[in-house]
């Protein structure tokens, strides 16, 4: 009987019991074989397991026709997904897993239990999420760089303003000093005018100088008279 199983050929959609190492004969369906995997999996069929929605590549020796082996292998089993698989093969034999890809490769010898397709889908999503997080990280790194550049530009502008600010007060001081000098010159200019007014004679045509000069001349005349009288007095006293 096993010899006939090895020689039996299955086609897509055939319902079988598939035997994997470490697992009971499981309700399954012969699925499509991808063209890319035909050479590497010669004489092996891609099998879809009901209940678990996993896939594997198995040879004819590990496959048994469902109708012929239902009484032998279709007994209830405590393994998770087995009862669901028996229900699906009877009521929904065309079921497919969400995100199922027929190109996935599984081997009963290499893998004790085929992994569900959903796991691979989750891995892809996770990879995409990691990729997006990397992009976000780049953006976050770029933003501080831009902020640093902007801050550097602001610092440079502030430094230029500080350098210009001491020059401006100095220029303002120079302007103020010039204005003060101009004011002092203007304040000194009226003094000669006043001196000219004081030097003018009190009465026009009198020919006399200022009152102070007249007083000095009178004092000098009196002193000369006293000196002239002084010898006469001395001679009289000597007599």
Swiss-Prot record:
Keywords: Acetylation, Cytoplasm, Disulfide bond, DNA-binding, Growth factor, Heparin-binding, Isopeptide bond, Nucleotide-binding, Nucleus, Phosphoprotein, Repressor, Secreted, Transcription, Transcription regulation, Ubl conjugation. It comes from Bos taurus. It holds the Pfam family PWWP. There is a cross-link at residue 80 (Glycyl lysine isopeptide (Lys-Gly) (interchain with G-Cter in SUMO)). There is a cross-link at residue 80 (Glycyl lysine isopeptide (Lys-Gly) (interchain with G-Cter in SUMO2)). It is found in: Nucleus; Cytoplasm; Secreted, Extracellular exosome. Residues 135-172, 180-197, 225-239 have a biased composition (Basic and acidic residues). GO terms for cellular component: cytoplasm; extracellular space; nucleus. Residues 110-121, 212-224 have a biased composition (Acidic residues). This is Hepatoma-derived growth factor. Residues 69-239 are annotated as: Disordered. Monomer, and domain-swapped homodimer. Interacts with nuclear proteins NCL and YBX1/YB1. The modification Phosphothreonine is found at residues 184, 200.
């Amino acid at each position: 009987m096993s010899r006939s199983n090895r020689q039996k050929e299955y086609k897509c959609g055939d319902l079988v019991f598939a035997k994997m190492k470490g697992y009971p004969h499981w309700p399954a369906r012969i699925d499509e074989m991808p063209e890319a995997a035909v050479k590497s999996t010669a004489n092996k069929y891609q099998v879809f397991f009901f209940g678990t929605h996993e896939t594997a590549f198995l040879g004819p020796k590990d496959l048994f026709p469902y109708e012929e082996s239902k009484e032998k292998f279709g007994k209830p089993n405590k393994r998770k997904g087995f009862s669901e698989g028996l229900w699906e093969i009877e009521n929904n034999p065309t079921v497919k897993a969400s995100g199922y890809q027929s190109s996935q490769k599984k081997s009963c010898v290499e893998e004790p239990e085929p992994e569900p397709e959903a796991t691979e889908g989750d891995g892809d999503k996770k990879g995409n999420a990691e990729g997006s997080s990397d992009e976000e990280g780049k953006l976050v790194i770029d933003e501080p760089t831009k902020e640093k550049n902007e801050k550097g530009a602001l610092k440079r502008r502030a430094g230029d303003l500080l350098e210009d600010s001491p020059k401006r007060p100095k220029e303002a001081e120079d302007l103020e000093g010039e204005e003060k000098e101009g004011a002092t010159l203007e304040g000194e200019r009226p003094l000669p005018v006043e001196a000219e007014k004081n030097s003018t004679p009190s009465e026009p045509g009198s020919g006399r100088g200022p009152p102070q000069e007249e007083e000095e001349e009178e004092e000098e005349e009196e002193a000369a008279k006293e000196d002239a009288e002084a010898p006469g007095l001395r001679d009289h006293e000597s007599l």
